[in-house]
């Protein structure tokens, strides 16, 4: 078993997808496909493997447009830039902004639900 100090450190980043068209929502599959393609496009295959970004699938909320992505702690800034450069999802203009970063998923989920008004 690996000692905790030797385990790869990770960060969870809460992103918000802001569509240009007010009230527009996206299907979970559309968002995940667009984000994964953008990450590979910006990171390249080698850096993608090192950063190991993963979309925490159960965290996507269609109404609020929020999603949490897990990434290696050294690559948080690169991930934020890669997703900020994403301008379209399914032919709709979008802006993606990073809301918060945490090393603990539970804390980020609480922040996410606090922002959307859920308990």
Where are these regions (language model features)?
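Long, charge-dense
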Residues: 24, 86-119
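Helix N-cap motif at beta-to-alpha junctions
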Residues: 70-77
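A short beta-strand motif that forms part of the nucleic acid-binding face
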Residues: 73, 83, 102
